[in-house]
Structure formats: C-alpha cells, structure tokens
Amino acid sequence: MTTEGVRTVGVEEEFVLVDPDRHAVRAAASRVLARGDRDGAGGPPGGADPDGDLDGDLDVELTREQVESGSAPHTSLAGLRGSLVGLRRAAARAAEAAGVALAATATCPTPTRPTITPKPRYERMRGEFGLTAREQLTCGCHVHVAVHSRQEAVGALDRLRPWLSVLVAMTANSPFWQGADSGYASYRTQVWQRWPTAGATGAFGSPAEYDRVVDLLIRTGAAMDDGMIYFDVRLSHHYPTLELRVADVCLSVDDSVLLAALARALVATAARQWAAGEPVPTVRPELLRAAGWRASRHGVSGELVDLERGELVPARALVDRFVEWVGPELSATGDGDAVAALVDNLFARGTGADRQRAAYARRGRIDDVVDLVIRETTTMASP
C-alpha cells in the first residue's frame, strides 16, 4: 500500500537465541514466544506492549534456536525505527524471562547443532532437504516494499537486480561459522545458497512468466510451496509487496533502517524505470551471483563488482554511486540526509561483520563475539 504517494516499507528480522553465560545457542523459541504472548509481545501486529502498542509481531522460525519479528508497514523511517526498536525490546524481554538472550547475528559464532521446530511443514522440509535444512540456523533481514500491481512488481524486480550485491555488502553480519572465522563477511549468504531456489534470477518479463517458473519449481520438488521460493527478490504471496531477501540480519537498528530506506528507494527507482518503458539491464545471472559472492566475501572492506561497467571498484565508490542512483526517490520521501548520515556511520564503525571480528581480535575469544552481539542487539533498543 502507499500513503500520499509514499510506498510503505516493513521489515522482518530473525534472531538467534543464546545462553548469555555459556554463549551457546538454546532451543528456547517456544518459551520465548510463550513469554512474549504473556507480556503482549506475540500475536498479530498491534499487540499490547508494556510501554505502548507493539507495532508488529514475533513468531517461530525453521529452528528452535531462533525467533522472527515482523514490523507493521510504515511510510516514515522514524516510524519504522520506532517499530524495530519496540520489537527488539519486547523480544529481548521475553528472551530474558525465558533464560536466554536475543542475538542479532546472521550465523551463530559458537559451534551449534540446531534442531527443527516441531511443526509439520518444517519437519517435512527436514525430510525433503536433509542436511540443508538441518544446518540452516541463519538469520536474515527481509524488507517488504509496497507495489501497485503484480506487473509493476515484476517490472521493478527485473530492473533492480544489478544493485542487490551492494545491499549484501552493507549488511554483512556473519563472519563466524561453527566457532571459526569463515573468511566471509556474510557467510549466511553462502549457506543460504544451498537451497535449490535461492539466489539471483534472470529477468521474468511478466507476472505470467514469474508464475510459470514458480509453479515449475514447486512441481519439480525444488520448493514445497510458495513460501520456499527463496529468490533474492520475490513477489510476496501474502502482501502486495516486493520482498528483498538478500540481507543478513543487522547488528544494529540503524543498519536495519538504512537497509529499509535503500530498499524502498531501489524498488521505487526500478518501478519508475519500468513505467517509463526503460529496458531491462542485460546482466547474466552468473554475473549477479559473482557480484553477490564478492559482496559476501568482503563486505565493504574491499572492492565490489560494478556490473554496469564490468570492473572491480572500491566498495565506498559503488555504494556512493548506488545512493546517487536512487537519490531522487530518497529526496521524494525526505530520507536523503538521514541515509547520507547512516552510510557515513556505517563506513566509520564498520559492518556487523567488522565489529564481530574486532571483538574477537582483542583477546582471541569467540565468547567475546557473542557478548558483543547480545549487547549491540539491544543497545539501540534501550528505553
């Protein structure tokens, strides 16, 4: 939906549940959700919160060691930020009451053996996809941006694909895997690619072609249903939105807000190009995957792939060019100054991956990384 021409944006964040003393993951999702329901932190958007109305909801995910929050749709970044802060606070309170801590990291730094949530759909996923499902303790941040029609959605999807790797780099927050440095800034991206429907796509051209591809993936068993269409960007099967799914869950609320602002501007810019009849960029899925791999590997610390020019460029240069490209839409929503400040802050303090590695480097202890993540998850959400 839109309000006075401004597209709404909503954010889903997935979190790991950890023992704050032993620093290991805990299969506590059901206890956390039970406490959340008791305190008004679960259920549909708009549930009661001790400090006001909780602007969103909490839910279970594939594994018992994680929970997911979902904000209500907003037109203003301030409103969205307030929603995300409230949800993190509510989830952290519920987690603490259940004896665990909330951790905004896209992979758990310590060794883990996740367990599947006992729901028929998730148990079927385990049976159909084996180790891919059993090891899938990863946490993403998904952004829903309102669209006016399915035609506009596909037109925008086809045109925004070359810029998605920039969002991967900016949100990288998963350098550790099973207790060791993975060598990647976003190792979640690599783990996620195991799913047969995950990753970059070619251009679809029309809703009919999009539907044909989705139907074929389901009929061949690559996906059990629409919910397992794990494209980098997909048409939501619940809401009139495009859902951008490339990002790690962000360590801080500020980074989540920056992601949402850029995602909305990206969709709006691509939709404007579609409406104007501008051609779809001729970029092969293989090159989209290569750009995503490099963003996953280095974050914003090295060079990224400039798909338009076909060369490697410094990460900051490509980020600045991306922000300039979506600049008219940022100006239209009044977000230009806020985004500029958030980008500067991101490069000044580093991505979540940079901060996790810095915590480890001080003493060489993975427990310090977990402590940092727990602290940073709720620092911006403090009353």
From Swiss-Prot:
Keywords: ATP-binding, Ligase, Nucleotide-binding. Residues 35-56 are annotated as: Disordered. One of its GO terms (biological process) is modified amino acid biosynthetic process. GO terms for molecular function: ATP binding; glutamate-cysteine ligase activity. It is an enzyme of class 6 (ligase). It catalyses: L-cysteine + L-glutamate + ATP = gamma-L-glutamyl-L-cysteine + ADP + phosphate + H(+). The keyword Ribonucleoprotein does not apply. Its EC number is 6.3.2.2. Pfam families: GCS2. The keyword Cell inner membrane does not apply. Belongs to the glutamate--cysteine ligase type 2 family. YbdK subfamily. NCBIfam families: gshA_cyan_rel, PRK13517.1-1. ATP-dependent carboxylate-amine ligase which exhibits weak glutamate--cysteine ligase activity. This is Putative glutamate--cysteine ligase 2-2. It comes from Frankia alni (strain DSM 45986 / CECT 9034 / ACN14a).
